[in-house]
């Protein structure tokens, strides 16, 4: 999968089917949008437009905790069939007018011929752009537009907010169910006090990024991959 972090005036991309969203965690709801774009049409290249950072983190200066490292997010998108990802820093597009986003990024740069998003997708300056505006622009330019309905779990839409709440409460089973796969993170192994080794239970100490969301303090069964 090709990854691009900035928008230029010209693009060599073929016609694309674009999935729009932050895709924080690539949970089951996100997967529905991504698969819809990936399975749209063989003549259209499956692509994703996303942001490099969590929108709320940039706007409010609060740390919500990312559900998936950027490299893991990219790997998951590729796993679901995405061949191109545009992922600029949110700060570079947050003041863009909705119409400029549609024309400049979706149509001119990404060559979108089909667009997919969730029903609550917002974009542009002050989040002024919505699905109705996007639908009208797509219809005017002969571009397919599809709103993918939410995926429900116990009658409630799957969301990154629910997953964060589950992790903070230590409910890994719920978080995994909403994600559609085991929660994962990665960190650098660092030396500790070697107490586990002395007790006969060697452990691995990891240094996590301050951006990561770490589950509630406790003991968890995990599968660990080292140097992989």
Feature locations, PLM:
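A cross-family glycoside hydrolase active-site/sugar-binding cleft signature
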Residues: 49, 88, 118
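Glycine/Thr-rich phosphate-binding loops of Rossmann-like dinucleotide-binding domains
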Residues: 56, 95, 125
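Short acidic-hydrophobic, aromatic-tinged amphipathic segments that line or gate anion-handling sites
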Residues: 1-9, 86
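ATP-dependent adenylation/nucleotidyltransferase module used to activate substrates
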Residues: 77-78
